[in-house]
Amino acid sequence: MAKRDYYEVLGVERGSSEADLKKAYRRLAMKHHPDRNPDDKASEEMFKEANEAYEVLSDASKRAAYDQYGHAGVDPSMGGGGGFGGGAGGANFSDIFGDVFSDFFGGGRGGGGGGRGGAQRGSDLRYTLELNLEEAVRGTTVNIRVPTLVNCKPCDGSGAKKGSSPVTCPTCGGIGQVRMQQGFFSVQQTCPRCHGHGKIISDPCDSCHGEGRVEESKTLSVKVPPGVDTGDRIRLSGEGEAGAQGGPTGDLYVVINVREHAIFQRDGKHLFCEVPISFTDAALGGELEVPTLDGRVKLKIPEGTQTGKQFRLRGKGVAPVRGGGAGDLMCRVAVETPVNLSKRQRELLEEFRTSLENDESHSPKASGWFEGVKRFFGDL
């Protein structure tokens, strides 16, 4: 069966750029990859066809030969040169398939694990710091103890016993990866001998057993700025795990969690609290002390105050950590009904109730409520 034109296979024009070729090939590889189409012979053939087309068109010399002579210019069976051996002059599919595999499995090829040999950055650490509301609002300094990995002192992080040193891996030549030939294309894999490090330790350190790092807990002083809230993070640069083979140390992220307060609730820069008052103070008005984070302040209660009435104390909230003026303290009134009354108190309340009978002028909502009840039952 005659071969299709390589440009047609990839769905591109003859003058397409290298970037366009790569984009087209990647799209086809994603669509027809065997991992996505198991037992689908048609997709398998399309996948192979796309591989063959891209290997030729991504190589400048092969592309020039193909453009001039067609398939005969690149197919040795037809008298052409080159072929599809995937040798030194062949196309390198590893970069493309790094992206393809990333899309398959949700991650790239980078990171602290494998990758190319040599120094590797240490992992970042996370520490949850519990604070009370006062500490979060005012700021504080806290000492924390964090388990981590540090460089082994006897071998100075090399992993090799004192007097010896790691040697270059003969399998990968210190790169940390090896090229594997798979059909028409080649991919790079982590070296199975050095596990991606590029070095081999023949005489490992007795303290770290060749790892170059050991577990240790260290105490750190964390300065918490005023105004932090739950979810805020403080970054301590260079306080994460030590890097492998002399790589840079990771960072430590201290994540703030503010505990619930017995009196105040926080919403951003504003605070809220409930203030209980007697029904006599609510009816007659008065003055009472309410708590704030700065101490007690006096709050004037007008006569006839109802449950749910909210009073705003400006500037008595929280000054945000990222700047700006302090929020407010919102005090919600809750009128308390007296209990455990004495005989005299009951008598006085009975007299008071009698004096209010048939007089709705003293109730701010009664008339409207009773009218609503009448309409409700009238509609039934």
From Swiss-Prot:
Note describing how the cofactor binds: Binds 2 Zn(2+) ions per monomer.
Cellular localization per UniProt: Cytoplasm
Pfam families (UniProt xref): DnaJ, DnaJ_C, DnaJ_CXXCXGXG
Query: What molecular functions are annotated in GO for this chain?
Result: ATP binding; heat shock protein binding; unfolded protein binding; zinc ion binding
InterPro entries, sorted: DnaJ, DnaJ_C, DnaJ_domain, DnaJ_domain_CS, HSP40/DnaJ_pept-bd, HSP_DnaJ_Cys-rich_dom, HSP_DnaJ_Cys-rich_dom_sf, J_dom_sf
Which residues make up the binding site for Zn(2+) 1? 152, 155, 205, 208
**Zinc fingers (CR-type) at which residues?**
139-217
Keywords annotated in UniProt: Chaperone, Cytoplasm, DNA replication, Metal-binding, Repeat, Stress response, Zinc, Zinc-finger
**SMART domains, per this entry?**
DnaJ (SM00271)
Per its Swiss-Prot or TrEMBL entry, what cofactor is needed?
Zn(2+)
Give residues annotated as binding Zn(2+) 2: 169, 172, 191, 194
The J domain is annotated at 5-70
Q: Which domain of life is it from?
A: Bacteria
Q: Where do the CXXCXGXG motif repeats lie?
A: 152-159, 169-176, 191-198, 205-212
GO CC terms: cytoplasm
Per the record, the GO terms for biological process are: chaperone cofactor-dependent protein refolding; DNA replication; protein refolding; response to heat
Where would you say this protein principally sits, based on its record? Answer: cytoplasm
**Subunit text:** Homodimer.
Entry function: Participates actively in the response to hyperosmotic and heat shock by preventing the aggregation of stress-denatured proteins and by disaggregating proteins, also in an autonomous, DnaK-independent fashion. Unfolded proteins bind initially to DnaJ; upon interaction with the DnaJ-bound protein, DnaK hydrolyzes its bound ATP, resulting in the formation of a stable complex. GrpE releases ADP from DnaK; ATP binding to DnaK triggers the release of the substrate protein, thus completing the reaction cycle.
Family the UniProt entry places it in: Belongs to the DnaJ family.
The written remark on domains in the entry is: The J domain is necessary and sufficient to stimulate DnaK ATPase activity. Zinc center 1 plays an important role in the autonomous, DnaK-independent chaperone activity of DnaJ. Zinc center 2 is essential for interaction with DnaK and for DnaJ activity.
Q: What is this protein called?
A: Chaperone protein DnaJ
Natural source organism: Pseudomonas syringae pv. tomato (strain ATCC BAA-871 / DC3000)
What is this organism's lineage? Bacteria, Pseudomonadati, Pseudomonadota, Gammaproteobacteria, Pseudomonadales
Give the gene symbol.
Answer: dnaJ
